[in-house]
């Protein structure tokens, strides 16, 4: 499987921002989502978008911007942030989103069954702090370990985003992770800052990585990340 790099565009109040560990009161603004989408599209054909307003409110707030990115830039999109009802998910797919990422509502099994039977590409976000799942904009702790959530949800989806909340937006690098998943597509997010981080994640068995703050702060360039991804992809760690 090809190891993929997903540049991240987190949107709040119509602008690209990065939060520190997901805290909305620790925010840095970077600018226009469309401009960053255009820049990233020169190197990749798919980007990762988070509707932060949606994550905190419980309903997507920036799908108009996402639609414009898809239409005007022509890049493929996976998006998360506030997708907790059928109508929001349907609207995202209607405007051309390729993968809708759900976190909070993934634990509602009847809901998950319904949407995975109707829509292709549903992705589950396993948002972790201290080994436990957090939901509703990473605010509420669930009495469920990440590994147990995965075992419960793998029956319905084969694509996951694994986010380490305490590393997100920190540039601190990755934490030690022991692979607990099978052959599903597993994408890492949280603290990636260097080529070494990417190599280590590939060695663990991740199939891709989401990079946000490191790109905006220049600790790694998208070109450099893609070169590393190309080299680790040839070694095919994920199938070992």
From Swiss-Prot:
Keywords from the named record: Amino-acid biosynthesis, Cytoplasm, Histidine biosynthesis, Isomerase
Active site feature: 10, 127
Family annotation (InterPro entries): Aldolase_TIM (IPR013785), His_biosynth (IPR006062), HisA_bact_arch (IPR006063), Isoase_HisA-like (IPR044524), Isoase_HisA-like_bact (IPR023016), RibuloseP-bd_barrel (IPR011060)
One Pfam family here: His_biosynth
The organism of origin for this protein: Pyrococcus furiosus (strain ATCC 43587 / DSM 3638 / JCM 8422 / Vc1)
PANTHER family: 1-(5-PHOSPHORIBOSYL)-5-[(5-PHOSPHORIBOSYLAMINO)METHYLIDENEAMINO] IMIDAZOLE-4-CARBOXAMIDE ISOMERASE
Chemical reaction(s) catalysed: 1-(5-phospho-beta-D-ribosyl)-5-[(5-phospho-beta-D-ribosylamino)methylideneamino]imidazole-4-carboxamide = 5-[(5-phospho-1-deoxy-D-ribulos-1-ylimino)methylamino]-1-(5-phospho-beta-D-ribosyl)imidazole-4-carboxamide
Protein name (record): 1-(5-phosphoribosyl)-5-[(5-phosphoribosylamino)methylideneamino] imidazole-4-carboxamide isomerase
GO BP term (any one): L-tryptophan biosynthetic process
């Amino acid at each position: 499987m090809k190891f993929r790099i997903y540049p991240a565009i987190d949107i709040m109040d119509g602008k690209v921002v990065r939060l520190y560990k997901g805290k909305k009161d620790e925010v840095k603004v970077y600018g226009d989502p469309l401009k960053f989408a255009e820049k990233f599209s020169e190197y990749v054909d798919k980007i990762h978008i988070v509707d932060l307003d949606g994550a905190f409110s419980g309903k997507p707030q920036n799908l108009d911007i996402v639609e414009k990115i898809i239409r005007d830039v022509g890049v493929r999109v996976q998006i998360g942030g506030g997708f907790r009802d059928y109508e929001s998910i349907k609207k995202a797919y209607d405007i051309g989103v390729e993968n809708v990422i759900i976190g909070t509502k993934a634990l509602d099994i009847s809901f998950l069954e319904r949407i995975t039977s109707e829509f292709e590409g549903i992705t589950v976000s396993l948002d972790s702090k201290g080994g436990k799942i957090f939901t509703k904009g990473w605010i509420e702790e669930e009495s469920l370990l990440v590994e147990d959530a995965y075992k419960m949800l793998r029956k319905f989806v084969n694509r996951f985003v694994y986010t380490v909340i305490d590393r997100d937006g920190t540039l601190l690098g990755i934490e030690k992770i022991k692979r607990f998943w099978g052959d599903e597509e597993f994408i890492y997010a949280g603290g990636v800052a260097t080529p070494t981080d990417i190599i280590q994640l590939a060695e663990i068995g991740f199939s891709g990585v989401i990079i946000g703050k490191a790109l905006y702060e220049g600790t790694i360039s998208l070109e450099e990340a893609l070169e590393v991804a190309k080299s680790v992809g040839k070694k095919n760690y994920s199938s070992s």
